[in-house]
Amino acid sequence: GILDSFKQFAKGVGKDLIKGAAQGVLSTMSCKLAKTC
């Protein structure tokens, strides 16, 4: 149903957001360590 497809959509978006946030944190940390930011 509509609710199920919305749940699937929200799950996918959440995963992408978490992935993006993790990558942002990692790149920020690595540039701070390398003093390149």
Curated annotation (Swiss-Prot):
Keywords annotated in UniProt: Amphibian defense peptide, Antibiotic, Antimicrobial, Disulfide bond, Secreted
GO cellular component: extracellular region
Disulfide links within the chain: 31-37
GO BP annotations, alphabetical order: defense response to bacterium
InterPro entries found in the cross-reference section: Antimicrobial_frog_2 (IPR012521)
Major location (coarse): secreted
Tissue: Expressed by the skin glands.
Signal peptide: none
Source domain of life: Eukaryota
Subcellular location: Secreted
Protein's job: Has antibacterial activity against Gram-positive bacteria.
Family: Belongs to the frog skin active peptide (FSAP) family. Brevinin subfamily.
Protein name (database record): Rugosin-C
